[in-house]
């Protein structure tokens, strides 16, 4: 599977400008609410028309503004799974799935329906209506309806957002198994970084309508390239920074100079440090702090610290470790050079 997306769309004051490619993988579009994730999916599916650009799937042009190509949704071979699954409430499980098989030759449809009923563990539920299914069964039915039509690409738009925490975990595990067993590519839209880490191979971060370069999920969490990517991946500590001649980074908000073991781009403007990267013993990158506030979580402690600059730091650590330091007002934190992340705009 090869997907090429290079489009722009303006809606009021919002301007979408995304450019990425995807192979046969589970790729996330990760970003905050309102950043353009769902609009991007709509453009790929043919529900939203871009103002200009090009969309191509497996060598077939789905949209090209210059060539005036704009295939209707039913001809794009793209399947969409939305937040509420959009099952037909008056139809049974089998009827819902059969509705997705209309693009296949008539002599293949019955066999295809039987195969996906088995593959999605829906046998015995064929005559049930959606209201009689659990959340996980509804999702399996919706995915079966999509995949019985043999799409070349599946779009998942926040598929867990309407579920409570316990059901969400169960449904996520089921979806993970399903995605491993089907060979079409998948675009997964979410604002939840944990879902991305568990389910996806690669990720493209969207920030205020603009896409960052695609990267592996592991690299996003280990060394995000931009401030937007760092924040959406959960980095709690970001300071404006200046690159010094010796390659160190002066962190303006924290009033400290830090060494980094990572590559420092010329246009580095910020430094990020994850909340769990700090220690109280080390040889490099000392940061003098004053304890300002302590917040107890069920299984960890969050310590808010004032630096010698105008900015604060957030440190998250094991409760037992904090108990050995409790009552301390002045602390010097240390961070390894490999944990200091240079960030561009």
Question: Residues of each region from the PLM?
Answer:
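ABC ATPase nucleotide-binding domain helices that frame the ATP-binding cleft
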Residues: 38-41, 141
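The short alpha-helix immediately C-terminal to the Walker A/P-loop
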Residues: 42-43, 202
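Catalytic "switch" loops of ABC-type ATPases
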Residues: 47, 78, 82-88, 192
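C-terminal boundary and immediately downstream tail of ABC-type ATPase nucleotide-binding domains
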Residues: 221-244, 272
């Amino acid at each position: 599977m090869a997907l090429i997306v290079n489009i722009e769309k303006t809606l009021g004051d919002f301007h979408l400008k995304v450019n990425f490619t995807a192979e046969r993988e589970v790729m996330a579009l990760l970003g905050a609410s309102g950043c353009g994730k769902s609009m991007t999916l709509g453009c790929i599916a043919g529900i939203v028309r871009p103002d200009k650009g090009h969309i191509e799937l497996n060598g077939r042009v789905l949209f090209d503004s210059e060539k005036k190509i704009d295939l209707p949704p039913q001809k794009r071979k793209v399947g969409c799974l939305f937040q509420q699954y959009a099952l037909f409430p008056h139809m049974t499980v089998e009827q819902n799935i059969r509705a997705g098989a209309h693009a296949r030759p008539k002599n293949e449809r019955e066999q295809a329906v039987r195969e996906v009923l088995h593959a999605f563990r829906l046998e015995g539920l064929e005559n049930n209506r959606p209201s009689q299914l659990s959340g996980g069964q509804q999702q399996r039915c919706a995915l079966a309806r999509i995949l019985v039509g043999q799409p070349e690409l599946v779009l998942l738009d926040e598929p867990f957002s309407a579920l409570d925490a316990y059901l969400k975990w169960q449904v996520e595990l089921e979806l993970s198994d399903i995605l491993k067993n089907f060979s079409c590519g998948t675009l997964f839209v979410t604002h939840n970084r944990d879902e991305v880490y568990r389910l996806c191979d690669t990720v493209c971060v969207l920030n205020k309508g603009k896409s960052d370069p695609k990267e592996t999920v592991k690299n996003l969490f280990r060394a995000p390239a931009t401030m937007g990517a760092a924040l959406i991946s959960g980095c709690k500590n970001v300071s404006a920074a200046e690159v010094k001649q010796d390659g160190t980074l002066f962190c303006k908000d924290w009033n400290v100079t830090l060494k980094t073991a990572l590559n420092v781009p010329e246009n580095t403007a910020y430094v990020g440090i994850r909340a769990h990267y700090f220690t109280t013993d080390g040889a490099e990158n000392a940061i003098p702090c004053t304890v300002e506030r302590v917040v107890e979580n069920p299984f960890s402690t969050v310590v808010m610290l004032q630096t010698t600059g105008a900015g604060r730091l957030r440190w998250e650590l094991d409760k037992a470790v904090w108990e050995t330091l409790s009552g301390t007002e002045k602390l010097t934190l240390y961070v390894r050079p490999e944990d200091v992340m240079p960030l561009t705009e």
